[in-house]
Amino acid sequence: DRSVSRGLGDVYKRQVLGDGMADEPIEAAGGKTPLQLADKPVMDEMAKVSEQGIAYTVPSNLPAGSDVANLSMLGYDPQVYYSGRSPLEALSIGVDMKDTDIALRCNVVTVSEDEDYEDKTIIDHSAGEITSEEAAILIEAVRKELEDDEYKFYPGVSYRHLTIWDHGEVVELVPPHDVLGQKIGQYLPKQEKLKEMMKKSFDILDHHPINEARAKRGLNKANSIWFWGAGTKPALDDFKEKTGMNGAMVSAVDLLKGIAVGANMRNLDVEGANGGLDTNYHGKAMAAVEALLEKNDDFAYIHVEAPDEMLSLIHISEPTRH
C-alpha cells in the first residue's frame, strides 16, 4: 500500500494484493510459508525500506476467504457488508439480483470416474484452469438440461460460474478447494435439489465433446458442477463517498470486479489477465499506472489471483515462480 506524489501536490495511492500469498507454514517445506520460499527480490527490497505491520482482515466468525479479506482491505467491514461470495460475482457478470434471490458459485470441477457419484473423489477444483470459452459451452449444456423457473445458470470466467436460486435459502456448502483428494459424499449439499443437479451434471458433462477433446490433450475434464459460496444481494457504500477517492480496480476475477461494481469503482480490463499463473502481470501494472497518471483516479487496487490458485492446488514449487 503506497502513496506517491505526482506533481501539483496531488497524491495517488496504489495497493497490491497477492491473494493467498502468505498462507500457512507447510511441513513438507521445512515449516516455511510459500511466501518465504518464493524468489521475490523486489518485494524483499521494498520490505527493507517500508513500514510493516499485521492486519487482521478476517473476523473469527466469518469464513477465511478472498471475499471477506478483500472487502476488509478496501475498507468495507465484512461484519457489516459481507453477504456471501457469489452475490459479489453476480454484480460483475451483470446479474440483477432480487432481494429474494440466493446466488451460488457454480464451479466446473474434475471428479473421478467412480460409478457412484458419492464415491467420486474431487481431483481439481478448477478443471485444469479451463478456458472461459470451453467452460461457457459446458455451462450452456448444463443450463439446457437443468435450468428451470427456480434455478438460472450464468457463465463466468474460467471455472467460476454462477447460479441464481429464486426464493432460495442460504445453505451451508463446502468449497471444492477445501476437499481436494477426498471422496465427495459427505461434502455434498444437504439440500436435495442442489445435490441432484450436481449428480446429473456428471452425466451431462463427462462425455461432452469439449471434455473428450480435453482428455485427448491430457487435460482434466470439467465433468461436474459444484455449488458453494451462497449469499444474498449485496449493498456496498460508494467508494468515493466513503474514502474521498476515485477508485480503480485491476483484477481478472469476477469477485473483485463485482466488489468494484458494487462500490462504484472503475474496472480496468487488461488483455491477457486471466486470474492464473501466466496472467499479464505487466499489463495489470501499466493499467494501474495509466489510471493514476492519465485518468481521474486517485487510488488503484491491483489484485493478483495466481498465488491463491496455485496454493489451492497445493503446488509448492509453482507459486514461488513470480
Please name every model-derived segment:
Residues 14-16:
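Residue-level marker for buried hydrophobic side chains located in beta-strands
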Residues 41, 46, 218, 308-313, ...:
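A long, amphipathic alpha-helix that forms part
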Residues 232-313:
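Anion-binding catalytic surfaces of enzymes that hydrolyze or transfer phosphate/sulfate esters
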Residues 126-224, 230-232:
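Glycine-rich, mobile lid/loop segments that gate access to catalytic sites or pores
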Residues 1-12, 314-322:
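Single conserved hydrophobic/aromatic residue that forms the stacking wall/gate
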Residues 113-122, 166-183, 288-313, 317:
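Active-site His/acidic residue clusters
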Residues 22-139, 143:
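Active-site nucleophile/metal-coordination loop of metallo-enzymes that catalyze phosphate/sulfate
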